[in-house]
Amino acid sequence: MIVQPKVRGFICTTAHPEGCARHVGEWINYAKQQPSLTGGPQKVLIIGASTGFGLASRIVAAFGAGAKTIGVFFERPASGKRTASPGWYNTAAFEKTALAAGLYAKSISGDAFSDEIKQQTIDLIQKDWQGGVDLVIYSIASPRRVHPRTGEIFNSVLKPIGQTYHNKTVDVMTGEVSPVSIEPATEKEIRDTEAVMGGDDWALWINALFKYNCLAEGVKTVAFTYIGPELTHAVYRNGTIGRAKLHLEKTARELDTQLESALSGQALISVNKALVTQASAAIPVVPLYISLLYKIMKEKNIHEGCIEQMWRLFKERLYSNQNIPTDSEGRIRIDDWEMREDVQAEIKRLWESINTGNVETLSDIAGYREDFYKLFGFGLNGIDYERGVEIEKAIPSITVTPENPE
């Protein structure tokens, strides 16, 4: 069938299989063109492996270091006239290319927060790899979590803490810049967001993998966070999501102590740059900030996407054969170019004057839009979007029981 983008709010409800495959192909080509990673990881587990930083780290591990990879994610296959989710198509393309290159790649689709999916993953690691996982990437962005032991349901929210936040935001599709007010979160919302986006599940994963002897001596595990400039602090760093990320950082310190004593391993936090992802599109204020950031970083020739960021994380931080450089809080900083003084001063200056009339010229909102559509496989060169495509794509390692068409 012919697949066109259908955008509702900040989400696109359709995905293009060939476009997603092309996008993944571009990332793979980037990784293959880089000098190979010496001393890179060999057996990598990526939790949240189908889009964004998780997918990019899977590609860098596989095509940059020749690693075997297992990816865990929650995606849906095509059903009837409904396309699959982008992460499903991304993984189908990744696995196909990895297998053709002689690389081990298997995936598990299900709720990563559940005990059942953890057990399935452990069984696969024991059966196929006999343990020995030397890198675990934790990259989950989810709106809700069911606690595996208590069954309690937590929903995460993106809200400030303490007081109503007033600033401006942009409707990326129309380019309309308007004032936005966001009411502060309740205590329950703060706790819930921490339960979903904090370090609780990361710790459960690492403890389970350790218990079943799945981790190698010297294992590293990395989770991602964002700090950003003061401009976004109220809604991000000092808001509910920031509170959850503080919990994630605390978890990293605890896991680091455990892994260090048991396996000479490390647990690390990587502070990444702001990028267009399905997760960041949902945060008020942030898309306008990213549109300005893109323009300035592109002008200075220091713009990076997910794949460039993950390449730098692996090459210059995790596997540089030197001590991993961190900030005073022990975090890896690959947001260093974004946070450069000259970049931030320019954004601050433009922020004051940006409005609906000048947003297209002052910012790179067009680049934001382009990246947003690309997440769903649209707007890629060399794809005829007027042509019908087969929307059912198989992920080689996953057997799907066909649902009744809706």
Swiss-Prot record:
Record-level Gene Ontology MF annotations: enoyl-[acyl-carrier-protein] reductase (NADH) activity; NAD binding; trans-2-enoyl-CoA reductase (NADH) activity
Gene3D superfamilies listed in its UniProt record: NAD(P)-binding Rossmann-like Domain (3.40.50.720)
Pathway the protein contributes to: Lipid metabolism; fatty acid biosynthesis
Binding site for substrate: Y226
Record's keyword annotation contains DNA-binding: no
Entry EC no(s): 1.3.1.9
Catalyzed reactions per annotation: a 2,3-saturated acyl-[ACP] + NAD(+) = a (2E)-enoyl-[ACP] + NADH + H(+)
Gene Ontology BP annotations: fatty acid biosynthetic process
Superkingdom of this protein's organism: Bacteria
Role this protein plays: Involved in the final reduction of the elongation cycle of fatty acid synthesis (FAS II). Catalyzes the reduction of a carbon-carbon double bond in an enoyl moiety that is covalently linked to an acyl carrier protein (ACP).
InterPro entries reported in the protein's UniProt record: Eno_Rdtase_FAD-bd_dom, Enoyl-CoA_Rdtase_cat_dom, FabV-like_NADH_b, Trans-2-enoyl-CoA_reductase
Subunit and partners: Monomer.
Entry keyword set: Fatty acid biosynthesis, Fatty acid metabolism, Lipid biosynthesis, Lipid metabolism, NAD, Oxidoreductase
Family: Belongs to the TER reductase family.
Name under which the protein is recorded: Enoyl-[acyl-carrier-protein] reductase [NADH]
Sites marked Plays an important role in discriminating NADH against NADPH: E75
Active site as annotated: Y236 (proton donor)
Organism encoding this protein: Coxiella burnetii (strain Dugway 5J108-111)
Binding locations of NAD(+): 48-53, 74-75, 111-112, 140-141, 245, 275-277
HAMAP family from the UniProt entry: FabV_reductase
